[in-house]
Amino acid sequence: MTKNPYAWEKCKLGEVARFSKGSGYSKNDLVEHGKPIILYGRLYTNYQTIIDEIDTFTVEKNKSVISEGNEVLIPASGESAEEIARASAIEKSGIILGGDLNIIKILTKLSPHFLAITLSNGNQKLELSKKAQGKSVVHLRNSDLETVVLLHPTLPEQQKIGALFRRLDRLITLHKREWIKSPL
């Protein structure tokens, strides 16, 4: 029997990625000009599947965590289990990654954009929500992320899916800008 080249594979996230955390920056550390930084709050206030423009800056501290490129970010804390289950891909390197961020570095077989879409929707979003712990503030740990079950097609298919969502995101952004500019 020949293997279907379009079949999706199943794996645990911990089998295809390594995990780390951002390091301690807060809104008080932001400056008008400096090194670009992503704080965990951005994943709530300016959520994007792919973060490709950064509008917050800081002065770099010792032992800062700097993006290598192609990571996926998930908040480590939030107000609700549903809210915390969201992910964003960061393709650029050289960006400071602030505290309260779970950082996923893909080792093989996965597109960061596809992974961010997958973790933010459907069964994986539900699985992340169930793993979040806490009452008034919920937390999601990297050890929780390692056991998330993923289904994924081949890398070329993931890239096609990611490209489609990127076009949709850009179209939505364009329409939002036009809507904001238009008079009532």
Task: State what each model feature region is.
Residues 1-3, 25, 59, 135-137, ...:
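Short, recurring structural edge motifs at helix starts
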Residues 1-8, 174-184:
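Short amphipathic coiled-coil heptad-repeat segments
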Residues 2-22, 147:
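Non-catalytic DNA-recognition/assembly elements of restriction-modification systems
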Residues 11-14, 41, 122, 143:
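Structural detector for helix-capping/boundary residues
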Residues 14-26, 41-69:
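Sequence-specific dsDNA recognition surfaces
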Residues 44-57, 72-97, 113-117, 126-130:
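Short, ligand-facing micro-motifs at secondary-structure edges
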Residues 95-102, 132-156:
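A short glycine-rich beta-alpha junction/loop motif
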Residues 159-171, 175:
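Extracellular/lumenal glycan-associated surfaces
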